[in-house]
């Protein structure tokens, strides 16, 4: 069976299926040829964007709030279609995907949208904010959305929804590359918008298309300053390196890089059975929530210990607690692996044979905990998955910092005092977020900085309109003739 993935271009659904692609797990899907329909995907004229500024920012918010009422699995045929795709193509169970869709309605609440607007400033998104400069010039500044290609991640439905909302709030034009392991959500968003408000300018400002990554024939035509001014890339190293070759004057690159996240278990973690149990429950959620598919999931935890035999035995017992708590996570947020890589499982099994260096708990589709007895994290720490955690005992924070780089997005800490003690140190080592253990997955990237970026601000083009005449701003040509001659 070949699954059909349409192009949705500026409010129109294109179902001329003729190009077949192989999915990650064996199934085929078929799409329209994006080269054939590039003229439909691109704006015919930049003046089409002007319709977005004939509606108010309040109208934009109302549109998104109304959209939230239609984003319902029980009544939305496009979400039901996407759920069938999720069973075949997604990395996680369809139950987790449905739970994520349900939670996305929070992003469409008026309070959330207003908080997002505040990160840029309503006065900049709604109109031209006036600034009176010291030299007499009056500057009026407006933040504009622009035509942007979004190469989103497929590790869940979140990136598609985030792109939809962000694009609407800045009133840009989004061309979304559909990820091969999350084929449904972006299309469902676009088609739901068409059902709700087919002629609305925001509906026509969100297009979705699948093309094979690295298709230089298509990308060289799409990634041109006359077509897009931004590329927002959520891809990995190879993907971003590939996209970067299209960056030139007139095209900016905004990256939300795949990151890794860590935990720090201060000495107080092991002070009592109560603190150990609490930390284990929290850490289990940080590891297993979303099946460890997110950048915010913990993959390595550094445990401060004196290195004694007794302390190592305590950490082994703690590791078992974490493993047991992972098994108790609710099925709507976590499950056993459904597509487990045999190569990964072999790596974990090999470590279990090295008793002097590693203590391994689990290591199968249920997940696992690997305790490094020699103080070094496993050599595939950045690629830990399927709810697999590496606990690394270290004597102090300095011993841990050699592992902390710009690649680390979130650090969860326990107890709370660790955050205040280390936040500056972690920041200068490149960490972008420090939070309480158990809250690593509760990341409000819609409002707070995302991967070190203020996303909405960075996605805008900031335009200044200057009034130099009202206050007679200085200029060489305004000086008296005699003074010029001198």
List the model feature ranges, each with a label:
Residues 1-140:
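N-terminal Rossmann-like NAD(P)+-binding subdomain of aldehyde/semialdehyde dehydrogenases
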Residues 38-42, 189, 240, 273-284, ...:
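Well-ordered, non-membrane alpha-helical segments in soluble/globular domains
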Residues 113-197:
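Conserved small-residue-rich beta-alpha loop and adjacent elements
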Residues 132-148, 211-222, 367-383:
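Donor nucleotide-activated moiety binding/catalytic core segment of transferases
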Residues 170-175, 201-202, 222-229, 404-409:
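Short, surface-exposed connector motifs at secondary-structure boundaries
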Residues 173-177, 232, 254-255, 412:
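Short hydrophobic alpha-helical runs that function as membrane-insertion/retention elements
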Residues 197-300, 305-307, 448-486:
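Conserved NAD(P)+-binding/catalytic subdomain of aldehyde/semialdehyde dehydrogenases
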Residues 281, 289-409, 420-427, 434-467, ...:
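NAD(P)-dependent aldehyde/semialdehyde dehydrogenase
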């Amino acid at each position: 069976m070949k699954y059909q993935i349409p192009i949705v271009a500026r409010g129109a659904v294109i179902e001329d299926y003729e190009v077949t692609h192989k999915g990650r797990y064996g199934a085929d899907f078929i799409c329209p040829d994006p080269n054939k329909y590039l003229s439909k995907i691109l704006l015919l004229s930049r003046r089409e964007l002007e319709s977005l500024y004939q509606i108010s920012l309040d109208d934009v918010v109302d549109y998104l709030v109304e959209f939230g009422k239609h984003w319902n699995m029980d009544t939305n045929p496009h979400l039901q279609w996407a759920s069938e795709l999720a069973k075949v193509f997604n990395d996680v169970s369809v139950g987790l995907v449905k739970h994520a869709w349900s939670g996305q309605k929070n992003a469409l609440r008026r309070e959330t949208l207003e908080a997002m607007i505040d990160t840029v400033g309503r006065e900049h998104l709604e109109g031209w904010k006036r600034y009176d400069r010291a030299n007499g010039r009056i500057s009026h500044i407006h933040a504009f959305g622009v035509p942007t290609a979004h190469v989103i991640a497929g590790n869940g439905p979140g990136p598609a929804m985030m792109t939809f909302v962000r694009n609407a709030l800045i009133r840009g034009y989004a061309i979304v590359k559909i990820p091969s392991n999350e084929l449904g959500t972006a299309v469902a968003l676009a088609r739901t918008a068409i059902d709700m408000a087919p002629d609305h300018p925001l509906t026509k400002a969100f297009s979705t298309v699948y093309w094979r990554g690295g298709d230089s024939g298509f990308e060289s035509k799409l990634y041109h300053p006359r077509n897009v001014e931004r590329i927002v890339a959520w891809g990995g190293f190879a993907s971003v390196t590939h996209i970067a070759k299209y960056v030139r004057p007139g095209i900016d690159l905004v990256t939300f890089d795949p990151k890794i996240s860590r935990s720090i278990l201060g000495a107080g973690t092991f002070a009592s059975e109560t603190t150990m149990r609490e930390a284990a429950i929290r850490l289990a959620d940080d590891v297993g929530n979303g099946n460890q598919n997110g950048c915010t999931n913990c993959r390595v935890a550094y445990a401060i210990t004196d290195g004694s035999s007794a302390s190592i035995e305590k950490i082994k017992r703690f590791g078992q607690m974490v493993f047991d708590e992972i098994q108790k996570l609710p099925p709507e947020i976590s499950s056993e692996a459904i597509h487990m890589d045999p190569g990964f499982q072999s790596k974990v099994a090999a470590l279990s044979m090295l008793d002097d260096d590693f203590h391994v708990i689990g290591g199968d589709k249920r997940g696992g905990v690997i305790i490094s007895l020699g103080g070094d994290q496993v050599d595939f720490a950045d690629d830990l998955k399927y709810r697999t955690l590496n606990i690394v005992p270290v004597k102090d924070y300095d011993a841990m910092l050699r592992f902390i780089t710009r690649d680390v997005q979130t650090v969860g800490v326990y107890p709370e005092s660790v955050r205040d003690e280390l936040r500056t140190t972690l920041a200068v080592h490149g960490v972008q977020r420090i939070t309480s253990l158990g809250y690593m997955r509760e990341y409000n990237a819609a409002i707070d900085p995302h991967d070190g970026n203020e996303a909405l601000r960075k996605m805008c083009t900031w335009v200044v309109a200057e009034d130099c005449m009202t206050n007679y701003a200085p200029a060489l040509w305004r000086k008296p003739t005699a003074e010029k001659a001198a």
